[in-house]
Amino acid sequence: MPEQSNDYRVAVFGAGGVGKSSLVLRFVKGTFRESYIPTVEDTYRQVISCDKSICTLQITDTTGSHQFPAMQRLSISKGHAFILVYSITSRQSLEELKPIYEQICEIKGDVESIPIMLVGNKCDESPSREVQSSEAEALARTWKCAFMETSAKLNHNVKELFQELLNLEKRRTVSLQIDGKKSKQQKRKEKLKGKCVIM
């Protein structure tokens, strides 16, 4: 499927095994797989309506490996929004996001206007937690981005993650409708602009 100029591109970054693919597959297809299959790069698409026209939410699930720096740079340069995923059971996976965030800043410039979510996945594995949510929240404040904990396995906060990411978009109105209900924030944005809804 050729890329359209009005595609809304979201890139998902994080170390290998943190659950990037699991989050994306849970959101797009509603499925979860127990086995770990390393990703080189996959793209998933979801049709959304945006300001009364159709556009595509294009989600790029990037590799957790450091072997493909050119692909990583390309995903950043083409991306409109970013999801930075670590596992709450691995401090190392949080540390590995720092150079990725720095690269986003370097390529994109003013990151305050770009939707970025810091995501602590695997919150269903709390007994093995290495990263406290308060610590990740503090990092998100430093990075001026939003923060959320998720569980792809339990489908906890998965749709909400993508909704919140789209709510951060200030340049146009894009949103998911969760069970047909709109948040007050969405209603307020829709009064100000057109509206975007996942079909």
Curated annotation (Swiss-Prot):
Protein name, per record: GTP-binding protein Di-Ras2
GO biological process: signal transduction
InterPro entries cross-referenced by the UniProt entry: P-loop_NTPase (IPR027417), Small_GTP-bd (IPR005225), Small_GTPase (IPR001806), Small_GTPase_Ras-type (IPR020849)
Catalytic activity: GTP + H2O = GDP + phosphate + H(+)
SUPFAM superfamilies on file: P-loop containing nucleoside triphosphate hydrolases
A Pfam short name: Ras
UniProt membrane topology term: Lipid-anchor
Main location per the UniProt record: membrane
An annotated Gene Ontology molecular function: GTPase activity
Residue numbers carrying Cysteine methyl ester: 196
